[in-house]
Every structure is written in structure tokens, then in C-alpha cells.
Amino acid sequence: MSIEKVPILGKETIHVGYGIADHIVREVIANLASSTYVIVTDTNMARTPQYSKLTDDFKTNLSEKRPESRLLTYCVSPGENNKNRATKAAVEDFLLQQGCTRDTVILAVGGGVIGDMIGFVAATFMRGVRVVQVPTTLLAMVDSSVGGKTAIDTPLGKNFIGAFHQPEYVFCDVSFLETLPARQFINGMAEVVKTAAIWNEEEFTRLENFSKKFLSVVTSKKPDLQSIKAELVKTVLESVRVKAGVVSSDEKEAGLRNLLNFGHTIGHAIEAVLTPEALHGECVSIGMIKEAELSRYLGILPPVAVARLSKCLVAYGLPVSIDDKEFLKKVGPKRHYVEIDILLKKMAIDKKNDGSKIRCVLLEKIGKCYQLKAHQVSKQDLSFVLTDEVLVHPFTNPPKENIIVPPGSKSISNRALILAALGNGTVRVKNLLHSDDTKHMLDAVASLKGAEISTEDNGETIVVKGNGGNLVTSGEELYLGNAGTASRFLTTVASLVGKSQASDDVILTGNARMQERPIGPLVDALGSNGSEIEYLNKQGSLPLKISAGNGLKGGRIELAATISSQYVSSILMCAPYAKEPVTLALVGGKPISQLYIDMTCAMMKSFGIEVTKSTTEEYTYHIPKGTYKNPSEYVIESDASSATYPLAFAAMTGTSCTIPNIGSSSLQGDAKFAVDVLKPMGCKVEQTTTSTTVTGPPRGHLKPLPHVDMEPMTDAFLTASVVAAVAKGGSSTSITGIANQRVKECNRIEAMVTELAKFGVPANELPDGIEIHGIDIEDLKTPEISKRGVSSYDDHRVAMSFSLLAGLCKEPVLILERSTTGKTWPGWWDILHSKFKIELDGYEPPFNTDKHVDKSSDKSIIVIGMRGTGKSTLSEWLASFLGFKMLDMDKYLEEKLGTGIKSLIKAKGWEYFRQEEAIVAKECFTKFSKGYVLSTGGGIVEGEDARQQLKSYADNGGIVLHLHRDLDETVTFLAADTTRPAYSSEVQEVWLRREKWYHECSNYHFYSSHCSTEDEFNHLRRSFVNYIKLITGAERPVVPAGRSAAVVLTSPDLNEVVGDLESITIGADAVELRVDLFKDTSAEFVAAQIAVIRKHADLPIIYTVRTVSQGGKFPDENVDELKSLLLLGIRLGVAYVDLQLTAPNELIEEISSKKGFTRVIGTYQDINGELKWNNVEWKNKYNQGVSMNADIVRLVGKANSIQDNLDLENFKKQNTLKPLIAFNLGSQGKLSQVLNGTFTPISHKLLPNDEEFLTIGELNQTYFDIGGFTAKKFWVIGSPIEHSRSPNLHNAGYKALNLPYQFGRFEATDVDVVYDNLINKPDFGGLAITMPLKLDIMKFATKLSDAAETIGAVNTLIPIEGGYFGDNTDWVGISNSFIRAGVPPKSSSNGLVVGAGGTSRAAIYALHQMGCAKIYLVNRTAAKLEELVKSFPKDYNLEIVETEQQADKASKVSLAVSCIPADKPLDGEVLKKIERILSNGSEQSAGFKPTLLEASYKPRVTPIMKLTEEQYKWKVIPGVEMLVNQGDRQFKLHTGFTAPYEIIHRAVVEE
């Protein structure tokens, strides 16, 4: 047993080794005499074999060496949330009860929580007893156990109450780490990296080299720590040595010890917000990068050091950004709470601060801190580094002169790395660009064993030992982010790679944008020369699968080089390694960016291979076979593209700037920017062979450049564009030769046009360029922050360019995604700040909780399913709702082949038809990829090719919708269809054969019920549209803000209660389907059950599969079937899917990642009532739900006493991060169900097991009885109102839901009388307002809805905090009446409004909301209509019809609303115009029958209704429907409850 001892404060009390339990016991018993030894640990550690061995050895040795002494053990609950006053007190009470005295020795065996808290217990118990620290986590070994800091947490922050109390010993037994989960292991490495970063550069280098082996071992299924035992012990030892040395110099943290807090100022603040989901080390890792960036921002730390630190942390699996993908998975929606102000407040109360002044440790280089102390930093600088959005303040007083050295050229850096990796020997590469691009390149080269890569000069020099082109596969995907250069160069390099045991191919992939960028011409050229390359996603773009071992044949290679010169350079650099010498011929016209091709040839020469240009063939190169010979040193020239930004700064501000290492001899085309662009625009340019100086004219005096061809320097066009924006003169500035910029990180030409417009600068695209119409600098507009400022498009050059124009505005300009500049110039913002003295601020955008889910765009939707399942009809509805075009692929095939399908099959057979069908499918999926609904033939899934295309479409974000219906109905339909070939087998057999394929090929599934009436058909359309809204993200389910209830359907077959569903769902805001209780859980049965619900209830569905262990019937062991059922729920478009917190992590992650727009309810149920609500396990379950990003957390306990319900209420108050459904079961738990707010489960006497939950009536009555509801009065006001049916409607609803409310009539013509008698009373609940008070009542409304403001009238008033809210529900009454009558909620058809009164305004608003392209207005007097038109926005597209001729010319109208008095005859002239418009709309239009709504509900049938229906065959809707539908919405506003629609409808209609 080898033990290393580390001195601290003059004593060798820190012992480090592997498997040293015996040593710990002997050392303590021999040297720390005591009557009582107490080992304190947590319940997790107590279950480990290492802990058992320690305690057993202690007991054995104690009985032998000190038989008079005793050993006590005590366990606390695990976790940071138990490191508090209460737990400390419990430990102290135990010690007192056991009669422990001042000679007690306490052993703290555990992680940092145990060490900190039990150390504090020892510091205060009996005024201080001896303590021994036995850390069992890596973090505790290297950090918390060393130095004597002890503490507990408080609600205000971590470690705010504690003491310095040095342990007698610290025993770091590395074998304890065998029990550590991988995440905890990785967590500890943050502190290890930290100590090396602040103190020991040599150890930091060792850690860089150890990372891969470390991560491989600790993340394996069965970690073998013995295999890295020596390195692990050294890792702990070296880190402990640093901390021990610092503590010995500064025990009480008066100065030097503050250095150990590097990364902790920001890290602790993040941790305080994200604990316990985020671990200490993870937060410190992010904090280190942010504090390193702060050092760089202040001009102290070189950019290379930040890049090196970041790379090292990432190599250990640690996050370096709050928005790290894996880190976000862990913290979930808590990310929302990481706000600048909150972090700054947390930092302001950090213990190492001087008062409220925030102090940070600043790095000077790896291994050394700046001035060996913490420094005061400004909140403004902290805000900047903490955000990815930046406010650029006006350039008020920039320095007159500046010298700027840009980073190394990205182009040269990437080429140098390829050449060095392919070469023989060692080369020291200096001034390499340390950016995202080169990081990806370095990682890829290392992964392919192309070279051994190390660093010197604190990371400034990259040492590359090339392997002479002997590369082999690694078995790992090579992820290249958005690094276009790396992707193109590595594609050819990958063709040279040999096979290894790890893999037979190389896969290159990147981020979403990278997978859109073109690489086709290069792949084509390589493919023709022997490479085997497969596109894994989109044709012509990454990801690519490149077969290893083929190499390049050599000989003549033809390549199209008009899009990217990088294709050329890629082949040029790899050509010497082909089997034969290469002749590279560039075809298709003049190559783009010739200077970059010349650069590549020049660099190849530096590495020993000379390219010769053909003397007989234009754009052709000869490359000999050979191997590169690496020079001893290669210095990368600074990036000329990057140099354009500081030079442009000088041009735009009238100052001077020098780039000392780029001149006329540069290899880079962009080096000519100053001479060819800035000089003609009025700048003074001085350029030597090695330097460039630009002096701008006085501010505002730049001249436009009528035309400049920037083909030799295309990347610089963005810089030129922002300079041209403020160059006002006699002409515009035209830049051409830059067509390739459309396929860079974004479409840069389009981006510049779009963003320049935000500054008020007109610009337009040219075929191969851009034209900018410069404006006076004083006329620049400041882009609106409320509209998200300036987008960078995740493009470094866009961000840097607009940072220049931003500073010329009069107000600060917001630029998004500033970190994108890390691609080529990570320190650009630091240069602006420290060199150009520009004021920058961080900016935090408002948080959007759904931002991780993008609403579906205009991507086409493919519809599949059996013939006769309604594909054509539902596809038409789908197209109508989305505004898409409809394409029947069977018809398209028939038109293409010039024959009918039936004839085709008869002539050539089914197999031929399936082949043609697959060809057409591929063509349609590509040709009609946007804005279409593609309805396929029923048998498309029969062909393997077609199936693969469908699967690929779904896998890549497209919707493939499977439609199905009852098979008996399908058979009936098909029997009558003679237009299609008959099946050779029965429908049932065909279905059984295809069923699996339909499910495999689709990602969504809709089961449509049989409809036998028009009402059922209309209801089906509403249900289908609601389904489409959800799966496309047009509408996401909203978690109710107030009280809400969900009726739990426990029937094994809903068809048994189908006739009672209307009654059963009264008062429910959702329906919970207990799928585990169904008599059959096959996909078809479950889909049919959901169809039953959708047919009879317009309510969101909560889809629950409860397992046996959680109180349900579904077998826990059937995990795969459970997963399939949950995924089926998502496919079926349910609003909420219930996901048990007890499910395997893999299942939770898969459902969470595939949920689409469905919300997730994370549920845990303690069916046996074992947990009290003050037990930490409930908190852990809640945190688990939050961590997995559940939209709602549901926790169900069991009450054994009334106190259990009160404890639950206390729990709810403390846990508010996510909406919480929490209640107790059992007879004693009813109170908790009444007090629950969100989706309280309710039952009904008609359901099985109805006694478990209350009915809606019982729930509301009990809530009223305990004071939850107060009795309220509601009124309809106006005159005359004696016949108003509003009281009937509302009171019927109150009665059905058992609400303690009354609705009455109050006749009034004066709103002040209403205020005094109704509004000003304590029991006032709300008003329904009719004429003549809809305008007058508005003076009492302190807040208005958008509808009320636009319509200009209020018909609903409710009390809100501090005043009253006014709304207008008339428009809802109109739109919902249409929708319930079968009209789609969105339609691009035209509308007609007859009349010019108040209701007409509501009708116009409603038709606009329903998507009407144009709304015609007809009235007896046109003057009133003109006033009406003026009061609405222009985009309403209102048109007055004054004459019969205008009526004749009107487009077809599908929707009409009559808002004229029904008790008077129609005006003759008005009638003529109406008739002409009605006659023009009589044809079926927009997928539904033209429909007229009568706004008057008396008489039941009005003259215009009679005329419209009988003469013109329109569908008509009586006015009573509008009354019911507006009352339905009004009821919700008044009470917060969903009205029982059928009941309120009967109360009005059957009066």
C-alpha cells in the first residue's frame, strides 16, 4: 500500500492512496485517543462495500486497541438540499443524546455535503471537537475536505454560515471513487483542472493528455479504475498539493487563498440558481470559462489560453456554457431562472467580496493568476461576458490611432494543419487561429491518427508530428459544427484513410446549417476517382459516409469550381497521395477565388510538393506523387478577412488603424481590401509588403463605389457593405462577383439586405452581388430592440460587420449571438472594448419557454393510409387550414404516365406500378417539398424504396400522417368504388399486411370516426383541425392558469359509456384516458378509443399508462411495450402524455426528445402512503420532474391524517418552478384534492371506481364550503333586456357546475348607475353588456383585450387586480358559430358583412381572425362604411360595395354575416347587392359550403336567412348560435371554468 503525504499548515495530515482503509483506521485509533468515535455518512454511502469495510475494520481494531472506547454511526439524507440548519441540528441532537463529550472524534465520510456540514458540527459541538475528513468523491478530495472550511447552506445562498475548523487528518482513499457515478466523477475534475490552471502549467498539460483515457474509463459500463490507478492518484495528489500550499500561506482567506476561487464567483452564482439539478463542478466549469473570457475581455489573458482551458474542460465532459446541450438536459426549464440580475445579486453577496463590490480571480496565463489576488470587476463587464446578446453603444470618442494584430488566418491555419498531418516530421505552427473551426480540424486530425499534436509556449505554439499520410478510421463520427473549410478539406482527406478494427468508414457530420451547405461537386469529383461516398441525409450536403481503404486513383480529375475554391484546395492538398500523379482540371467556367487556389499551391511548395500549372489547358494543374516534408517551423499569417474589420472601423470613424503583419505580399486575396475598396471610397491607404494602414476621411464623408468586383476577396464583401451603407453620394455602391456567398454560413447577400434595412439603408440583391444605396450617417435608424435588434444568422462575419455599423447609430444597437465570432476571431469584442474603447453591454432577451420547439414551417405534409379512410377529404381540410396546395399523387402519376392506374396495372402488373409509384414519390417529395399536402396511394408502403423515402422524410423533421378508420366502414366504402382496381385479397388481409409498414413509415396517426350526420361530420372536421394545430405547433396546449379539472375515464371500453360522455365531461377542462385500464392496448384499439373521445368531446386529452407499481394495471416489466404505447400517444396528437418518473432513464429521454408539441406530465405516485410530505424524497421527485423538462409535475401521495394534507400545502408553496398537480388519495385525502389547482382529477357516478375522486359538483361545493369560492353576482346590463337569454345561459352553467353564483338582469342606460349599484359592490363578479352601454362602459376598463380595442366596444367586464378588464366576445360568438357549422378556423376565402353598426365591427374582426383574404361591406348608407373602413388596419383588406356593378365584380364569397335589424324589411338596393354576391358564392368553395350567420336571434328565421338558404342554397346559422358561443367565452372569462356547452345551448335554444 503506497501512501503519499502532503503537508498543510506545518503538518503532514493529508494522506493520499488507493485502498487505504486499514491505514485510516490505524492512524486514527493510534494518534487520536477518544472515548467516542462517531462516523457520520449519508444513506447512499452507507450502502457501499468501501464504507462497510471501513466501519468493520474500525470496530475490529477498536476492540483490540481501545476496548474502552465506543464507535457510533449516524446517517443523514443525501443531497445538497439537506446541507442545512435542520440536518445539522439533528446530528447535534444525536451526539447529545448519546452522551458525547469534548474528547469525541468525528469522522466525516462522504462527499462535500458531508464534509462541509459535519465539519461545521465538529467546529461548534462542545465549542469544537476533533474531526477527520474521509472524502469519498473526487470533488471533496481535491476541494472541500482540504483547508478547514466548514459550512451549511441557507435559502439566500451556499455556505453562508460556517467556520474555519482544520481537520486532524484528511484521508483521500481513491478506491472510494469506484462507487462514484460517472457524472459525479466528471464533476470533480472541474476543481482539478482549476488548480492546475491557476498554479501549475505542467500539470495542466498532463491533464490535457490524460482526458481521453480518463473519460473512456469512467463512462464505461463497468469502470476499471485499476487501469488508471496511478494517473488517478497523481491527479488527486497534484491538485491537493496546490490547495494545501495555498492554504498554508493563507489559512483564513485574507488574500492568496482567494485564488482558489477562480471560476467560483460566477460558478457559485449559477449553482445557487440551478442546484440541485446542476452540480458544483459543472457550474464552476462554466464559471471558469466566463471568468477567463472576462480576463481576455479586459486585455489580460491571451485568446489561446481561453481556447485551451475550454478544450480541456470539454475533453473531461464538462460544460463550458449554460446553453451546453447536455447541461440543458440536466437543468431543464431552470435555465429560465439564470438571469443577469439574479446572478449579479448572488455574486454581490459572495463571501470573498469587499462589501457589495464583486471580486473575481483573473487568469494571466495557464498556470498563473493576474497579480496573485482577486480583483474588483464592474457589473457591466460581468453582464457582457454572461450573455450572448450585446448592446453596442455609439462610438463617441475612439482613439485616433490604433495598431491591431488579428488572429491567424483561418484559411492558412486549416491548410497548414492538413499539410502538417499528411507530412513527415515535426513542425511547430505559430500564430494558429484558435477558433471553433480549427478546433474541429485538430480534433479530426487527432481522431484519424493523422498526427501527434501537442502544445508549447503556453499553448501559443502547436506542435504537429505528422504520420506521412498514414491515417486510419476511429469508429467515431467526426463532428465539424458549422466549419465549412474543415468539412471540405476533410472530405478528401477521409478518402485517403485506411481501415482499422474500429470501423470500415469515416462519417463527417455537422450542425443543422452545415447539413444544408453544398459539397456535391467535390463528392462527385472524388466519386469519379475511386472514392465511395454516401449521403446520409440530404443529397449534396453533410453528413457523409466515406468508405475507408479505397484511396484516390489519381490521373485526371475534373471538378466544378465556380461555387467554392475550397473544393479545389481540398483535392490539391491530397493529390500527392493518390496512386498516380493527378491532373486537376477545373471545369464549368472561371474558378471562384483564384487567389485562394494560388495560396494552396504556395503552401504546398513550403511543405515540399510543387504544383505546376498547365501551359496547354486553362485552369488545369499537375500534381506529382509524393509525401510532404514538414518544415521545422511554420508561421501563420494574420487573417486578412478579419483585418478588414478594424480597417473599416478607421474608415467609418475618421481614425487611423495599422495592421502590422499583412501587406501587399500576402497570400490572401482579402489583403487588397484597403487598396481596392477603402481607398476609392475616400480613405488614405499606406501599404508596404508587410503592413497596411488606413486613415478614414472625416466622419460622414465616405464616397460610394459605383462598382467593385470582389471575386478575389468574397468574404470581405460584408465589411464593404456596411462601409457603403454610410457612403452617400451621387450613386449607389454595387458589389459583384460574390455569388458564392449565398451558400456560406447563411445566405450572406440576403442577410445583408435584410439587416441593412433595419438601419434604414436600402439595398437589393444582384444576380451575383448586392447594391447598397448609402445614406447620411445622421439618418441611420437604430434597429428596434423590441424586434430583436440585428440577427447574426450564427455567422461570424455578419456579426462583426454589423458591430461596426451599430456604433454609428445614435442609440445602442442589439446584436444577437455575439459568440459566433469565435469561428475566426474569438476576441473581436474584446478588441472593440479594450483597443477601440467602445462601451458594450450584455443584454438578456425575454425568455420563451417553448423556444426549444420550433413551430413547423411550410414543409409539406405527406398523408398515407388505406384506400377509403378519408385521405382525400381530410387532406383537403388539412391543405385548407394550413394554406397549402393539395396534390393527389395517384392523379399526378396518371398524368405523368398518361394512363389510369387501373389500366396500368392491368397492362403491366402490380410490380411495375409499385416501381413507378416509388419514382413518383421521390420526385414529389423533392419537387413539392414546401407548401403542399401530398396525398399518397393506399399501397405506397408496399414498396421498399417508397418506405425508405417516407421514413427518411419523417426522420428529417417532416410530417408523415397516417390516416385510418374502422375497417368495416372502409370495406363498405371500397365496395362502391369502381375507379380503382379491386384488391386481390380481402381488405382485412391487406390491412394486416400493411399495418406494421404504416406505423413504421409515419410519425403521426389520426383515426377518424364514422360520421352519419352533418353535425358529426362538422365535429370531425373541428377535431381534425385541432389535431393538426397540435402536431404542427400552430397551437400548443396551454397549462391552465386557474383552477382546472380533468375527468378520469376508467372504462375498459369507452363505447360502453359513449352515450353518457356529454354528461361525464361536464365541468372538465381535460379528459384523462387511463390506457392501462383498456381491455385491449393494441395500437388500433387505442386509436379508436381516442377517436371516440374526439367525436364526443372538444377537450384536451391526458394520455396515461399507469404501471402496477404506480397503482395501475400495466405490467412494469413490459418496458418496450410501454414505450410503444407512449410514443403512440404522441403520434395520436394528444395534448398531454403522462410519463412516470419511475420509468427507465432511456425511456424518459426518448419520450422527452420525441414529444413534439405534446406536453409531458411527469408523475410519481406513492401508492402505499410510505412518504410524508416533509420527506426529502418528494422534493427529489419534484426536482426530477423539473430536470427532465416536464411541463407539469404530478405527485400523488396517500393521506392517513388531516395533517398530511396540510403538509402537502406547505410542500406546494415551496415548489413553484413548474406547474404542480399534487394531492393525496384515500378518504382522508379528499381535502387535498379540493385544494389542488391544476387538472384536479374528478369522477362521475356513471364511471367505474367513481368513489376514488370527487365529482365536479362535490369539488366545487366543498371548495366553496371551506372558503375557496365566494358567492358572486353577475349581470346583463343595457336596455331593453327583459328578453335577454344571458341569465338562462349563465345560470344553467352555474347549476351544472355547482358554482355559488347568480346571474341577473339590470336595466340601465347610464353606466354610472351601473357602477354605483353593481360594480362597486363587494360581491361583484362581472357584467355582460349590451346596447346602449358597450361604448360608455369602456371608461371603467383599466385594461382592454386586443379585440375590444380593435372593435371599439366592450360586452364583457370583469374585476382584475387594480381595476377592471374589458373584452368583446361577440367576435368569438361569430367565429365559433362558423367553426361549429363546419367552417375551418382558418380559411383564405372572402367574406361579406352586411350593416355598419357595432356588431358589424365584431363581424369584420372575426372574419379577419378566420383568415379572410378580402372582406366586402354592404350597407344602406356608404358614409358609415367609410368611417368603419378607416378605423381598421389596412391589412384587413376591406372593400365597400356601393353599386350592383361592383357586386358583380366581387370575388367569390364563402362567409357572410348579417348585422342589420331583422324586424324591418330589407332595403331594396341593399338586397340587390347582397343577392349578386350570394349568387357568386353559391358554388362549393374552400372545402366547405358557403355559410351565412344571422347576428339577430329574433325572429328565429329572418328574411335574409330564408332568401340565402332557399334561393341561393347557402348554409345558414341562426343568431341564437352566436349568442350561445359568445356566452360560452363570456362564461369562461367570468368564472375561469369551461362552460358545459350542451347545457347552456339547451338553456338558450329550448327556452
Curated annotation (Swiss-Prot):
<dbReference type="InterPro" id="IPR041121">
    <property type="entry name" value="SDH_C"/>
</dbReference>
<dbReference type="InterPro" id="IPR030960">
    <property type="entry name" value="DHQS/DOIS_N"/>
</dbReference>
<keyword id="KW-0067">ATP-binding</keyword>
<feature type="binding site">
    <location>
        <position position="127"/>
    </location>
    <ligand>
        <name>7-phospho-2-dehydro-3-deoxy-D-arabino-heptonate</name>
    </ligand>
</feature>
<dbReference type="GO" id="GO:0046872">
    <property type="term" value="F:metal ion binding"/>
</dbReference>
<keyword id="KW-0057">Aromatic amino acid biosynthesis</keyword>
<feature type="binding site">
    <location>
        <position position="191"/>
    </location>
    <ligand>
        <name>Zn(2+)</name>
    </ligand>
</feature>
<comment type="pathway">
    <text>Metabolic intermediate biosynthesis; chorismate biosynthesis; chorismate from D-erythrose 4-phosphate and phosphoenolpyruvate: step 2/7.</text>
</comment>
<dbReference type="Pfam" id="PF01761">
    <property type="entry name" value="DHQ_synthase"/>
</dbReference>
<comment type="function">
    <text>The AROM polypeptide catalyzes 5 consecutive enzymatic reactions in prechorismate polyaromatic amino acid biosynthesis.</text>
</comment>
<keyword id="KW-0547">Nucleotide-binding</keyword>
<feature type="binding site">
    <location>
        <begin position="176"/>
        <end position="179"/>
    </location>
    <ligand>
        <name>NAD(+)</name>
    </ligand>
</feature>
<dbReference type="InterPro" id="IPR016037">
    <property type="entry name" value="DHQ_synth_AroB"/>
</dbReference>
<feature type="binding site">
    <location>
        <position position="143"/>
    </location>
    <ligand>
        <name>7-phospho-2-dehydro-3-deoxy-D-arabino-heptonate</name>
    </ligand>
</feature>
<feature type="active site" description="Proton acceptor; for 3-dehydroquinate synthase activity">
    <location>
        <position position="253"/>
    </location>
</feature>
<dbReference type="InterPro" id="IPR046346">
    <property type="entry name" value="Aminoacid_DH-like_N_sf"/>
</dbReference>
<dbReference type="GO" id="GO:0005524">
    <property type="term" value="F:ATP binding"/>
</dbReference>
<dbReference type="GO" id="GO:0004765">
    <property type="term" value="F:shikimate kinase activity"/>
</dbReference>
<dbReference type="Pfam" id="PF08501">
    <property type="entry name" value="Shikimate_dh_N"/>
</dbReference>
<feature type="binding site">
    <location>
        <begin position="80"/>
        <end position="83"/>
    </location>
    <ligand>
        <name>NAD(+)</name>
    </ligand>
</feature>
<feature type="binding site">
    <location>
        <begin position="865"/>
        <end position="872"/>
    </location>
    <ligand>
        <name>ATP</name>
    </ligand>
</feature>
<feature type="region of interest" description="3-dehydroquinate synthase">
    <location>
        <begin position="1"/>
        <end position="379"/>
    </location>
</feature>
<feature type="binding site">
    <location>
        <position position="264"/>
    </location>
    <ligand>
        <name>7-phospho-2-dehydro-3-deoxy-D-arabino-heptonate</name>
    </ligand>
</feature>
<keyword id="KW-0479">Metal-binding</keyword>
<feature type="binding site">
    <location>
        <position position="158"/>
    </location>
    <ligand>
        <name>NAD(+)</name>
    </ligand>
</feature>
<keyword id="KW-0963">Cytoplasm</keyword>
<feature type="region of interest" description="Shikimate dehydrogenase">
    <location>
        <begin position="1271"/>
        <end position="1551"/>
    </location>
</feature>
<feature type="region of interest" description="3-dehydroquinase">
    <location>
        <begin position="1049"/>
        <end position="1258"/>
    </location>
</feature>
<dbReference type="Pfam" id="PF24621">
    <property type="entry name" value="DHQS_C"/>
</dbReference>
<feature type="binding site">
    <location>
        <position position="116"/>
    </location>
    <ligand>
        <name>NAD(+)</name>
    </ligand>
</feature>
<feature type="binding site">
    <location>
        <position position="149"/>
    </location>
    <ligand>
        <name>7-phospho-2-dehydro-3-deoxy-D-arabino-heptonate</name>
    </ligand>
</feature>
<feature type="binding site">
    <location>
        <begin position="42"/>
        <end position="44"/>
    </location>
    <ligand>
        <name>NAD(+)</name>
    </ligand>
</feature>
<keyword id="KW-0511">Multifunctional enzyme</keyword>
<comment type="similarity">
    <text>In the N-terminal section; belongs to the sugar phosphate cyclases superfamily. Dehydroquinate synthase family.</text>
</comment>
<dbReference type="GO" id="GO:0005737">
    <property type="term" value="C:cytoplasm"/>
</dbReference>
<feature type="binding site">
    <location>
        <position position="243"/>
    </location>
    <ligand>
        <name>7-phospho-2-dehydro-3-deoxy-D-arabino-heptonate</name>
    </ligand>
</feature>
<dbReference type="InterPro" id="IPR036968">
    <property type="entry name" value="Enolpyruvate_Tfrase_sf"/>
</dbReference>
<dbReference type="Pfam" id="PF18317">
    <property type="entry name" value="SDH_C"/>
</dbReference>
<comment type="subunit">
    <text>Homodimer.</text>
</comment>
<keyword id="KW-0456">Lyase</keyword>
<dbReference type="InterPro" id="IPR036291">
    <property type="entry name" value="NAD(P)-bd_dom_sf"/>
</dbReference>
<keyword id="KW-0808">Transferase</keyword>
